[in-house]
Curated annotation (Swiss-Prot):
It comes from the Viruses. Residues 1164-1185, 1201-1235, 1521-1539, 1561-1571, 1884-1894 have a biased composition (Low complexity). Keywords: Repeat, TPR repeat. Residues 1186-1200 have a biased composition (Polar residues). This is Protein ORF1940. Residues 1160-1239, 1519-1571, 1862-1940 are annotated as: Disordered. Residues 1868-1883, 1895-1912 have a biased composition (Pro residues). Disulfide bonds: none annotated.
Length: 1940
């Protein structure tokens, strides 16, 4: 059927199919410790199905192709050939149909594998029987369908095997159900201690075999076992009983799934009987010792006999336990043996003593042993109970794995090539793993046996269900494949080679024939495996004992002939020690060539090269001999790159194709025609040596049996053996050097020779590894590479620069041969995409015709040109053109392949030794030696596609393992990358996907999925960073954390829904929480769900507040009665109390309102005696004392926390106005007025909702009770309690760990003065005595009094006076404590003296431990000695006074005393800039000092970064009195600039002329920002009620590098303010070491935004939209028309906005999540429709954000919008080109818009409104603006109204309108044009405003300067006055009239 060579598509189909089949085999397990992944098998099955379908289509197309028609036509005159070809066509058509059917079969198989995967999953989980049964039934149905198709198309054998699989599944299901029931009975029997029942049930499981013979064998073994166990046992036959039991246990088959259970249970039964017998014998010995009228000697003799029997029984039981159960059990029995030995020794020693002593000793032994026996039985019960439950799952896993193996083995299409490998791999693995080998004994450990038996369940299940019968030793292949071309076989061999790679390190392959004995043994094995699965044990025994040789195919020895595919065989020695040699060789070779960059680039060419041929032919009968003259230029040398023994042999031309198989004399005669002289065959070694020495070329003859030695005079052919002998002889004589020998051997390279030279080759590779980098890609091979046979020669460039002659012989006259060659050449080239494939196949065709050019020339039908073109990936191409020339042809090749070089002679690149080395490398590559490179490349490709987090994790893991590795270890690591990837996939990717898919199936949104995925991947990266190994990573805890996250979010959502919040708001809160979760995970923050909930609820405060007011019908007009500060607190309190369910109706809401209204005035009257004299309104809340901001705050915002952390620090600090003198020393009133109020609002219930840990409140309550017991006043107790609550709340909300002891210490230090004064007053201490103390003594006395009082050491005035005297006596002088007093004290207190007083040695040990800790912290010796002396002095004092010694309390006291010294040391140690302390208030400094000392002592400050973080925390969280008491609306702190609000109102006096003075602005009132970097303030100036502390430039200069500051300065001025604004927001709550990254990120963002938005032209589109609204009149039709036009303009605007959002989203993960919510994931492919959708959503959101409750858009409100919109432009940086010039002062409701357009009639407005709402649902704020590119802002004035401004939580500055109120405003004029005169100082202006609002007409544009615009009246219909506006009923009536 050679005619198939004319059908290239057939071969292509075979290649596709063969590759898919080989890939399917790759999912098989390569050793018995691994199992196939069912999902991989399903995927492979789908691949095969697709391959069959593709092959079917290819074949269907092929039979109708022009090639087939031409072949049938041309062979009409040749009947035989025509019939053969026609038959082939029919067969291919039939194959097309059958392949389609096979595709369906494999589809069903894939479905079945999915069901099997579910069953396998049940082996690791607790699945219900119904689930398992359902999956079994699904698999059965799919296999039945596949079997039906196979039967329909005549695949009889395949149908039978599929039917067998169905039966096996049914049997497996039945066995599963029986096994579950039986195991339940086993557990019950075991629980009751009935081991006989356990054994019987286990034996019933073992005998449940399908195979009759197997069942009989097990049944017989079971009977033998039970007989041996139940045999009579007495003191005389113990040894025989033991021997019989051991023999029966060892004879029981080990191949069943319960064999270990049978073995263990049998041993336990026997042990139990032996222990009971031993106990009985001991009792008899005991009775003997109690017998009367016996001497001690008689007692001893009788007792000894019984004890000896007992010892024997215990000893046999111990041996059974050690051999079959557990070494632990054996050890316990050994203890009994020791007790018997002890008894014997005691008995012998007391033989002549009183017999009662003997009896007592015996009783003790017997009792102990009896108890031990009972304990042992209980222990065995527990052990078995632990391991029984897993058997069901393990059996299920085994059944499924067995079926996977069977089903894969059914894949047809590869034939004996796969058969042999599968047989070999299965048998060799079973032997290698010891599964079927005879074992002399079993493990001593019960757990090891159980693991060995059940952790390889595939072996159990395959045997138990007779699955072994289908392992593929008998292949089902109805029709053998037709001829397969070389390419297909190459593909098959490459894939099959992958299967062999795992075995190469276990076996040694020799090139020897297989013996008949080995063949027979293999046949026997096949028979046994097919017939009796249980006898595998015997099979393994035969293999191991006889060391016989089992045949397996050598992958390089394959013959391909028309009708068959056969494989030559080599012996495989299954002797494990032989495996190490080859494994070592392969490892060394791989290591030596790991620098080869591109193993495929063997031949490279210039971008254009030419192959000129000038050939002349000489006729020699039926042969053609060709020569090539010398020529100038370079010649392409083709590489022999094919398997040496592969022959393409069409039967009719077999002799020709094999080449000129001429005998040596005949070949000699042919060669003589080339002017060579032949001397015949040489027999003399010296002649051969001489010929070699003078040779020009040496090559192997075509038959591989001779060597052709070419000299100047002749070519001599000698046998290979003589050639080798001559080389060895010449080497011995010194004629040849080592290098020359290597070169000569390489000339005739063969597999045998390669193996002999392995060590030498390896050595050379190592040498060249060090001497120079060896890169095949840099070497252009112009020389033939020798193989086992030389079938051709090529021209090469000689030493003289000219090519040597070409000597070739071939027969190409036969027409059919010419057609075959030409068709194959084109077919192999035209469909391929790689250049090296062309080279490979051209070489293969040259093996058919030694001169390719002559072949092409002879085959040319028409003169002229023809070409072959190949297009590869990435635009690469290769064109080969043939042009006929006189006397020959020219081949011209053009390519654009990169990195190619001109052809160079090999001799110029390498010396002889390197040539040999390179040839060996290429030979290894050809034989698959570097196949691991492909697997490595595939793995790297997969790794590159991993998410960044996982990629980073894997890279760090790999880098860590590479550190300090040897070269060989590094090679193994690189080779292990595929395994690392699979571990990552198995351990991380697959489990995470499974978990998330379950969530997705439950309807979880994408935001949840993305956040959780990042959580898991971040967890993996953290574990890798922590040093964990991939194979130990366990995501179980991460899944638990994820569930906690989901549960918490669900709880929040449920609570919000329970409170009645609308769904859209609840969903918005939920989405915001997940966005924050994702952000925290990505940034590496610890996940604090409580903090996230708190932050999100604060963000949504306004929406929730409005909802509550509407829900309970609150009159919003009441809000006008509140000051901005009161409104802010009311809003916060309402939201908090509503969520905590404290507000449930309108009454509760009104109570909250009344509390706010009444509360602040009281505070004002107590803490601010002098109010501002220039204001007429009531003082606002922000003028009150500090605690006023927190009295009603349960869950405060961060800004509020900062203002309320420390209400008071020292008794010398008061909260007063600026006029208060600093000499005031009275006690503060804050403690008595404000903090109790805070306690009332921070309830334990509220705090518990934040803290979650119930122990915290218990500890607080205990502390408070202790304070009350000490008699402290209630107010002081409440003050302390409030401070503790506030500190806990702050720590919980900021994510810090809550340390009650630390908090208590800090609060105690803060309240020291108050407690001190209380104690002095309580015990009547004369405070005049304090004048006698130095400042140092007073400080120590104060600390000691408070500490001793709190620890009950001061209980009366005597104790107090003693403390006073001690302090006065011990603390001397004005200097610091550590420098003057305690060192001298320490000199007088020796440890010995102190120990004699203290008595307790642990006290001094604790002191030593404390001192050691101080030294470890690096404190100076002098300070440490000072602290030690102080501690010893206090200990001495306490000991002498009889007080209990409390080291912790003493340590706390000393720490407080030495706080200043330690604080200074820490600052100096870390290089802290002490100038920064000037920025702190006294309260902040006190907290900073305490925190520094505490955190340094507890290792929380370890570097400067930690110290700076503590500084920032103290600066942020603690506010001094001056930060609030001096603040009045709307003034600002000296470092802040108020908003520039400009008025063109003639009634407003210019700055500097008003009489009023801002209470916060002493002097001129001018407040400006100094020039320089905008980072000086880091915040945009805003006018807010409670100023927040800002990070100043000076703070940042120690953090930010110069490069960052320079980048900021280079920004456009218009962008700087926005950058600063965002930096402020993002720096809140951040650590110091995060600041630099955040600042750089913000600068990056705005640089990119600027470039993006300029290109978008967004402002032009926006302008078009505005222009559309400039032509409105009274005509409603025109209005509607304009609205329609505006909609089109609006689309353009929205598209532009959408484009900007998409561009920013490319580097903004938050926007990516937002767009994903809109269904847009591919940011590089967004349609116009999607862009419009994005823009619409964004502008809608912005419109909602800009909305305010004010009805009329006033000029001031217009200014706010100008500012907000210009800020929006700042976001994109477009403010340098465009600014919002004007915001039209139009009303914002649609009705008023219509009125402004000229439609005055209210009913008409309603009608038009309905029409507008249909077409344009929302009029946006942007619809009302006018844009100018002049860069100016034209403010609009309105004379009659002036709002009061306030700043809400979000930082928005909004107006509030009050009736007849006068407000003082701070006015800053705009800067005049350059050159600017000095600006006049700003002054205040009193303005009276009313609610009578009259909108103006649009201002005219007269020439400058413009007159003040007039103020037209508002239409009556729109006036807010209720007297002028028509009622709703009147409007409705008017509308009805108009409609009628």
């Amino acid at each position: 059927m050679s005619s198939n060579y004319a059908l290239p598509d057939v071969f292509r189909a075979m290649a596709v199919l063969t590759g898919a089949l080989a890939k399917a085999y790759s999912v098989l397990p390569n050793d018995s410790s691994k199992t196939s992944n069912a999902s991989d098998v399903a995927e492979a099955s789908l691949d095969v199905a697709r391959a069959f379908e593709e092959a079917s289509q290819i074949l269907k197309t092929a039979v109708s192709s022009p090639v087939v028609a031409r072949a049938l036509s041309e062979t009409q005159n040749n009947g035989t050939l025509h019939d053969q070809l026609n038959s082939s066509v029919q067969n291919i058509a039939k194959a097309s149909t059958e392949f389609s059917a096979m595709g369906d079969i494999f589809k069903y198989q894939a479905k079945a594998q999915v069901s099997l995967a579910q069953i396998k999953a049940c082996s690791n989980a607790q699945c219900s029987p119904e689930t398992v049964e359902s999956n079994f039934q699904e698999a059965i149905r799919d296999y039945e369908a596949a079997s039906s198709i196979a039967l329909q198309y005549g695949f009889q054998s395949l149908a039978e095997q599929l039917s067998d699989a169905v039966n096996q599944l049914k049997t497996a299901l039945s066995n599963y159900e029986k096994t579950v029931a039986t195991l339940q009975q086993i557990k019950q029997a075991q629980a009751s201690g009935n081991y006989w029942q356990v054994l019987n049930l286990a034996l019933s499981l073992a005998s449940n075999q399908q195979n009759t013979q197997s069942s009989k064998n097990i049944a017989q073994a079971a009977n033998n076992l039970k007989s041996a166990l139940n045999a009579p046992l007495n003191s005389n036959n113990m040894s025989q009983y033991y021997s019989n039991v051991v023999s029966a246990i060892q004879s029981f088959p080990r191949c069943t799934q319960v064999s270990t259970l049978v073995t263990t249970t049998s041993a336990v039964i026997a042990i139990q009987r032996l222990l009971q017998l031993g106990s009985s014998e001991l009792q008899k010995a005991q009775q003997a010792t109690q017998a009367l009228l016996q001497s001690a000697e008689q007692m001893w003799s009788s007792a000894y006999n019984h004890a000896e029997k007992a010892y024997e029984a215990f000893s046999l039981a111990e041996q059974l336990a050690s051999q079959f159960v557990s070494q632990e059990l054996a050890n316990e029995i050994e203890k009994g043996l020791e007790k018997v030995k002890q008894f014997v020794a005691e008995a012998q020693a007391n033989m002549n003593a009183n017999k009662n002593i003997l009896a007592d000793a015996f009783n003790t032994v017997v009792d102990n042993i009896s108890n031990a026996v009972n304990d042992l039985m209980n222990w065995v019960n527990d052990l078995i109970e632990t391991h029984i439950p897993g058997i069901v799952g393990q059996i299920l896993a085994g059944v499924v794995d067995g079926l996977i193996f069977v089903v894969i083995s059914l894949i047809p299409g590869v034939g004996q090539i796969i058969d042999g490998i599968i047989a070999f791999s299965f048998i060799s693995n079973l032997v290698e793993q010891g599964i079927i080998a005879v074992k002399t004994g079993y493990g001593a450990q019960f757990l090891q046996q159980l693991e060995e038996s059940f952790l390889q369940p595939q072996n159990i299940a395959m045997i138990a269900t007779s699955v072994i019968g289908g392992i593929g030793l008998e292949r089902v292949l109805a029709d053998r494949l037709p001829d397969i071309r070389i390419g297909a076989i190459d593909a098959a061999k490459e894939k099959i080679g992958d299967l062999m790679s795992d075995f190469k390190e276990k076996i040694s392959i020799g090139l020897h024939g297989i013996s008949d004995d080995a063949s027979k043994v293999l046949d026997d094995i096949k028979t046994k495996i097919k017939g009796n699965a249980v006898s595998l044990r015997d099979v393994g025994s035969t293999i191991v004992e006889k060391k016989i040789e089992v045949k397996a195919p050598d992958i390089t020895k394959i013959d391909v002939k028309p009708e068959e595919i056969t494989a030559k065989n080599v012996n495989v020695k299954l002797v494990k020690p032989l495996s190490t040699d080859l494994a070592k060789q392969l490892s060394e070779k791989f290591k030596s060539v790991k620098n080869l960059k591109d193993l495929k680039a063997i031949v490279k060419v210039d971008k254009e090269f030419r192959i000129p041929y000038d050939l002349q032919g000489k006729s020699m009968g039926d042969k053609t001999v060709l020569t090539a003259d010398y020529m100038e230029g370079e010649v392409l040398g083709l590489i022999k790159n094919y398997e040496a023994d592969v022959k393409i042999s069409p039967t009719s031309f077999e002799k020709t194709i094999k080449g000129a198989e001429l005998k040596p004399p005949e070949l000699h005669a042919k060669l003589s025609s080339f002017d060579y002289t032949g001397k015949g065959i040489l027999d003399v070694e010296q002649d051969i040596i001489d010929a070699i020495k003078t040779s020009k070329d040496i090559s192997l003859t075509s038959d591989g049996k001779g060597v052709a030695i070419t000299t100047d005079k002749a070519t001599t052919i000698v046998p290979v053996k003589k050639y080798f002998d001559a080389i060895m002889t010449g080497y011995a004589k010194g004629d040849f050097s080592d290098v020359k020998v290597a070169e000569l051997l390489s000339k005739v390279n063969s597999s045998d020779l390669a193996r002999l030279m392995t060590d030498d080759i390896i050595k050379k590779l190592k040498d060249y590894k060090g001497s120079g980098e060896l890169k095949i890609g840099d070497l252009v091979i112009a020389k033939e590479i020798k193989g086992d046979k030389t079938l051709y020669s090529v021209a090469k460039i000689g030493p003289d620069g000219k090519p040597q002659s070409i000597n070739v012989v071939s027969d190409i006259d036969d027409p059919m041969f010419r057609a075959t060659v030409y068709n194959n050449l084109l077919d192999m080239v035209k469909n391929k995409t790689e250049f090296d494939y062309l080279v490979t196949n051209l070489n293969k065709m040259k093996s058919l015709s030694p001169d390719l050019q002559t072949t092409l020339d002879r085959l040319t039908v028409k003169p002229g040109e023809r070409s072959i073109s190949i297009e590869g990936s990435g635009g690469k191409y290769l064109n080969v053109t043939e042009k006929s020339l006189p006397g020959g042809s020219e081949i011209r090749a053009e390519t654009n392949l990169e990195g190619v070089k001109a052809v160079d002679a090999l001799e110029k690149e390498l010396d002889g030794e390197r040539q040999a080395t390179l040839e060996q490398l290429l030979e290894s590559y050809k034989n698959g030696g570097f196949r691991d490179v492909k697997a490595l490349a595939d793995a790297l490709g997969k790794i590159d596609k991993l998410p960044d987090t996982l990629k980073e994790a894997l890279a760090k893991y790999f880098d860590r393992k590479m550190e300090n590795s040897s070269l060989e270890e590094e090679v193994d690591l690189i080779k292990g990358l595929p395994k690392m990837y699979e571990d990552l996939k198995t351990k991380v990717i697959d489990p995470v996907d499974t978990f998330l898919n379950k969530l997705k199936a439950k309807g979880a949104p994408e935001s949840e999925i993305d956040a959780l995925r990042q959580l898991f991947y971040k967890r993996v990266l953290n574990e890798i960073n922590a040093g964990r190994s991939l194979d130990t990573i366990d995501l179980a805890s991460a899944f638990v954390k994820a569930n906690e996250v989901l549960d918490k979010v669900d709880d929040v959502v449920k609570d919000l829904k329970d409170r009645g919040l609308p769904d859209n708001l609840v969903n918005d809160i939920k989405a915001s929480m997940f966005k924050q979760i994702e952000k925290d995970v990505l940034s590496g923050k610890p996940l604090d769900i409580n903090r996230i909930e708190f932050d999100v609820l604060r963000q949504k405060e306004d929406a929730i507040f409005n909802f509550v007011l509407d829900k309970f019908g609150f009159d919003k007009n009441l809000l006008k009665n509140l000051t901005p500060d009161q409104l802010d607190r009311f809003k916060t309190n309402v939201v908090d109390q509503f969520l905590l369910k404290h507000i449930t109706d309108k009454n509760d809401l009104m109570d909250e309102y009344n509390n706010i209204v009444k509360g602040p005035s009281k505070v004002q009257n107590t803490t601010q005696p002098s109010a501002t004299q220039n204001t007429t309104t009531q003082p606002t809340a922000q003028n009150t004392s500090l605690p006023g901001a927190t009295q009603n705050t349960t869950l405060p915002t961060p800004s509020k926390v900062q203002n309320t952390t420390q209400p008071s620090t020292t008794p010398n600090t008061t909260l007063s106005t600026p006029s208060t003198t600093p000499n005031t020393t009275t006690q503060p009133t804050v403690q008595n007025t404000s903090l109790p109020g805070a306690v009332q609002n921070i309830t334990p219930k509220d705090l518990q909702s934040i803290v979650k840990d119930p122990k915290v409140l218990d500890e607080i309550n205990a502390t408070v009770e202790k304070l009350k017991d000490l008699g402290l006043p209630d107010k002081l107790v409440d003050d302390i309690k409030a401070s503790i609550f506030k500190k806990i709340e702050n720590d919980a909300l900021s994510g810090k760990p809550i340390d009650i002891n630390n908090i208590w210490t800090n609060i105690l230090m803060q309240k020291e003065d108050a407690i001190f004064n209380f104690v002095l007053d309580k015990f009547g201490f004369d405070k005049n005595l304090l004048k006698n103390l130095t400042p140092e003594q007073l400080a120590k006395f104060k600390t000691d009094v408070v500490t001793d009082f709190m620890t009950n050491r001061i209980v009366d005035k005597t104790d107090l006076m003693q403390t006073y005297m001690d302090v006065k006596a011990t603390v001397k002088g004005p200097g610091t404590t550590q420098n003057t007093t305690t060192p001298s004290v320490a000199q007088n207190i020796t440890l010995k003296d102190l120990q004699s007083i203290v008595k307790d040695p642990k006290v001094l040990e604790q002191v030593d431990a404390t001192i050691k800790r101080l030294k470890d912290l690096g404190l100076p010796d002098k300070l440490v000695d000072d602290i030690k002396a102080s501690m010893l002095e206090q200990i001495k004092k306490d000991a002498l006074s009889g007080k209990p010694i409390d080291i912790n309390n003493i340590w706390t006291n000393i720490l407080m005393q030495k706080e200043d010294a330690i604080f200074d040391f820490v600052l100096d140690k870390f290089g802290f800039d002490k100038d920064l302390l000037k920025n702190l208030t006294p309260e902040q400094l006190a907290k900073f000092k305490t925190d520094v000392v505490t955190d340094f002592m507890t290792n929380r400050i370890v570097d400067k970064t930690d110290l700076m973080q503590t500084y920032m925390d103290a600066k942020t969280l603690v506010k001094g009195p001056s930060t609030t008491q001096n603040t009045t609306q709307p003034s600002t702190t000296p470092n802040m600039t108020p908003p520039k609000i400009e008025f063109k109102d003639q009634n407003v006096k210019p700055p500097g002329t008003g009489a009023g003075t801002d209470v916060n602005t002493p002097g001129s009132g001018s407040q400006t920002v100094t020039s320089g970097s905008g980072l000086q303030l880091l915040v945009k100036p805003k006018e807010i009620a409670a100023q927040e502390e800002k990070i100043k430039l000076k703070d940042l200069q120690s953090i930010l590098p110069e490069e960052t500051l320079e980048r900021f300065e280079k920004l456009p001025d218009s962008l700087k303010e926005k950058v600063i604004d965002e930096i402020e927001t993002r720096l809140r709550g951040k650590k110091v070491d995060e600041i630099e990254g955040i600042v750089n990120d913000v600068i990056d963002k705005y640089e990119k935004l600027y470039d993006s938005a300029v290109k978008d032209g967004m402002l032009n589109d926006l302008k078009n939209l505005i222009d559309a609204y400039s032509k409105k009149d009274n005509n409603a039709t025109e209005v509607l028309t304009d609205v329609g036009k505006s909609l089109e303009v609006l689309k353009d605007l929205n598209k532009s906005v959408g484009t900007s959002v998409v561009e920013e989203a490319k580097y903004n993960s938050t926007l990516q999540t937002y767009l994903a919510g809109l269904g847009i994931k591919d940011l590089n492919n967004v349609s116009d429709k999607q862009l419009i959708k994005i823009g619409t959503d964004v502008t809608n959101t912005l419109s909602e954000k800009f909305g305010t409750p004010v009805v009329v858009l006033t000029p001031e409100e217009a200014k706010i919008l100008v500012k907000e919109l210009n800020d929006t432009l700042n976001d994109t940086g477009l403010n340098t080109k465009f600014k919002i010039e004007e915001v039209k002062p139009l009303p914002k409701t649609l009705e008023v818009i219509l009125a402004t357009l000229g439609i005055k009639n209210e009913t008409k407005q309603r009608i038009l409104l309905k029409e507008l709402q249909k077409k344009l649902p929302k009029i946006r704020i942007t619809d009302l603006i006018v844009i100018s590119s002049k860069g100016t802002i034209t403010p609009i004035t309105w004379d009659d109204i002036m709002p009061t401004y306030y700043t809400n939580v979000q930082g928005q500055t909004l107006p509030i309108y009050t009736t007849q109120t006068t407000t003082t405003h701070h006015i800053t004029p705009p800067p005049p044009p350059p050159p600017p005169p000095p600006p006049p100082p700003p002054k205040t202006q009193t303005i009276t405003t009313t609610t009578q609002i009259t909108p103006p007409s649009p201002p005219p544009t007269p020439p400058p300067p413009p007159p003040p615009p007039k103020s037209p009246k508002m239409p009556a219909s729109l006036s807010p006055s209720s007297g002028n506006a028509p009622s709703e009923a009147e409007a409705e009536q008017a509308e009805q009239v108009l409609l009628i």
